[in-house]
Amino acid sequence: MGWGIVPALPGVARAAAKLSGMQSWRASLLWFDPEADGPRPHFESDGLLVTAADAAGVQRVVAVGAYDTLRPRYSDVAVHDRRGRLIAPGFIDLHIHYPQTDVIGSPADGLLPWLERYTFPQEARFADPGHAASVARFFFDELLRHGVTTVLAFGTSHPGSVDALLGEAQARGLRCIAGKSLQDRHSPDGVRDETEASLRDTEALIARWHGRDRLGYAITPRFAPSCSDAQLHGAGALAARYSDVWIQSHVAENLDELRWVRALYPQDRSYLAVYERFGLLRRRAVYAHGIYLDDADRALLARTGAAVAVSPTSNLFLGSGFFDYAAAREAGVTLGLASDVGGGMSFSPFATMRAAYT
């Protein structure tokens, strides 16, 4: 979480107050300035946050700090008094499945039975654009209720599911990166896609959404077992062609899944190595879970710049295991926290952080 602060001379700021739509809020403030201070937080118990519109009409942070220090500089700017409340940057959820919103808390004996029994039947409903739009609205309502303003999200295998999600995010001015799930094998009717059509759909979605307002696209192989070699090869080719898009998938979440991958890909050293072979490890690649990685895998992640989305509530609920934070940090792996709804039990980042501390 962080605010990009636009420098402004006090005299210029006052003169431009009416023209720029300048506003300010008095409250307790928590913020980060990673370029100046790394991960160190800043806190003001009585702070002032000042914003103004840029040339495009987007509100930007002009100043943030102690109320007594900043108020004289912006004395003619109206103040919204929110004392007793905390203002902070929005949270980021690094891995979430919006189509699984309605399967939260559905019990099963591990990941693979859970997918078959609950997830795939629910995701098949997203062939209906009306259903996708309804869930997208509720999904963002819940995220905002819990202070989340940026997500890296899975759609279903239906392109319309991504259109519904990104369209809703755009309407609300939120930061959302999402992708259509690629899964041309080992998936039931209703969610299984066709190899060539899935790649054409992915490229069309990139053209339609990537870089539009605050939106981005993620090439999204569901996980290696759900994708044929041809589909993974095509995904890697798209990742090379569109180097600024994201990649998202799952890796090493569950022991049964791990055994399945070994049977499907005996030529690869590890589950993660499958993605490497198809050109799917690089910066802007995010892999969820990563519970059963070894030292060579962690070194590969650090070398390629790919990141892991740690999903503690999901890992606990589905009985998958515990992530090795110490080994990942020692190897220099980039990490982020994720709710992994609907395997995860809550949209709340605080619930995710509590589970991570367990």
Q: Can you annotate each of these PLM segments?
A:
Residues L49, Q59, G84, H95, ...:
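Divalent metal-coordination and catalytic microenvironments
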Residues G105-L174, S198-G211:
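Alpha-helical scaffold segments that flank or form the walls of functional sites
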